[in-house]
């Protein structure tokens, strides 16, 4: 079963349309228009085998960086705690001012907070169609981690 969670009703309508277009069994999919962190608070631990955490940009300027890193930590701690042993978390950031290193540290802190053993299986970067101009390194804003949760 797939649960799709987003605070945007428009996004959830598009998800539902794509489920229909793809010919997927609608009984095996639930769309929930709710804040992801609020949703995760009520989900039983070990519910999911796989979770994709892909929030909107939490920091659009340097002044928002510390709050963004705390938000990434809270969201990832909630996600890691809801994944069953042997499960996976794909987690992403599209915040330009959040470096790969700072994002990874927020995720590491989240894992430590949960007390779960977590391994990085892969570091994910933006694809080649999001080329980075050498004179604008901040253009390398998409980053992610594939985590294995023991």
Which residue ranges define each predicted feature?
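Conserved SAM-binding motif I beta-strand of class I
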Residues: 1-6
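S-adenosyl-L-methionine
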Residues: 8-52, 58
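Flexible loop/turn segments at secondary-structure boundaries
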Residues: 10-12, 38-40, 59-61, 97-100, ...
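Amphipathic, non-transmembrane alpha-helical secondary structure
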Residues: 37-41, 73, 77-80
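Residues at alpha-helix caps and immediate loop-helix transition turns in enzyme cores, especially N-
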Residues: 44, 64, 71, 102-103
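C-terminal catalytic and target-recognition region of SAM-dependent MTase-like enzymes
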Residues: 47, 74, 88-150
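Mobile active-site "lid"/loop adjacent to the S-adenosyl-L-methionine
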Residues: 49-78
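Helix-to-beta-strand junctions that scaffold the AdoMet/dcAdoMet cofactor pocket
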Residues: 83-85
């Amino acid at each position: 079963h797939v649960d799709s969670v987003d605070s945007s009703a428009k996004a959830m309508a598009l998800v539902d349309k794509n489920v229909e277009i793809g010919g997927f069994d609608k009984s095996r999919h639930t769309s929930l228009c709710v804040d992801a962190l609020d949703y995760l608070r009520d989900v039983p631990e070990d519910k999911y085998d796989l979770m994709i955490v892909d929030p909107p940009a939490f920091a659009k300027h340097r002044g928002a960086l510390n709050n963004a890193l705390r938000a990434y930590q809270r969201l990832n701690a909630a996600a890691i705690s809801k994944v069953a042993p042997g499960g996976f978390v794909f987690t992403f950031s599209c915040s330009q001012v959040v470096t790969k290193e700072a994002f990874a540290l927020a995720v590491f802190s989240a894992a430590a907070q949960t007390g779960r053993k977590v391994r990085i299986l892969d570091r994910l970067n933006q694809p080649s169609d999001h080329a980075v101009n050498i004179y604008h390194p901040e253009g390398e804003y998409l980053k992610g981690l594939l985590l294995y949760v023991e």
